Amino acid sequence: MVFQLICSTCGRDISEERFALLIKKIALKTVLKGVKNSCCRLKLSTQIEPQRNLTVEPLLDIN
C-alpha cells in the first residue's frame, strides 16, 4: 500500500511515481524522467520514506 503524496507547491498528485519507486522498484532516475515540475522532482527525491520493517523483536528473553 502506498499513501497518497501531493506536492505542496503545485498540488500535483505524485502517488503513481511513488508507487513506481516503492513497489515496482524502478530507479529514481528513471521515474524522474517523466516528472516535469522541479518542485515535484525535489519532493520525490527527498521525501520518499524507505519501506519500514514492521517485525518486532523482543527486548528480553523470558524463559
From Swiss-Prot:
InterPro entries to which the protein is assigned, alphabetical: RNA_pol_7kDa_chordopoxvir
Reaction it catalyzes: RNA(n) + a ribonucleoside 5'-triphosphate = RNA(n+1) + diphosphate
Source organism superkingdom: Viruses
GO molecular function: DNA binding; DNA-directed RNA polymerase activity
One of the record's GO cellular component terms: DNA-directed RNA polymerase complex
Main location as per UniProt: virion
Keywords: DNA-directed RNA polymerase, Early protein, Nucleotidyltransferase, Transcription, Transferase, Virion
EC number: 2.7.7.6
Localization in the cell: Virion
Induction or repression: Expressed in the early phase of the viral replicative cycle.
Any one of the GO BP annotations: DNA-templated transcription
Biological function: Part of the DNA-dependent RNA polymerase which catalyzes the transcription of viral DNA into RNA using the four ribonucleoside triphosphates as substrates. Responsible for the transcription of early, intermediate and late genes. DNA-dependent RNA polymerase associates with the early transcription factor (ETF) thereby allowing the early genes transcription. Late transcription, and probably also intermediate transcription, require newly synthesized RNA polymerase.
Family, per entry: Belongs to the poxviridae DNA-directed RNA polymerase 7 kDa subunit family.
Quaternary structure (record): The DNA-dependent RNA polymerase used for intermediate and late genes expression consists of eight subunits 147 kDa, 133 kDa, 35 kDa, 30 kDa, 22 kDa, 19 kDa, 18 kDa and 7 kDa totalling more than 500 kDa in mass. The same holoenzyme, with the addition of the transcription-specificity factor RAP94, is used for early gene expression.
Protein name: DNA-directed RNA polymerase 7 kDa subunit
Organism: Rabbit fibroma virus (strain Kasza)
Gene: RPO7
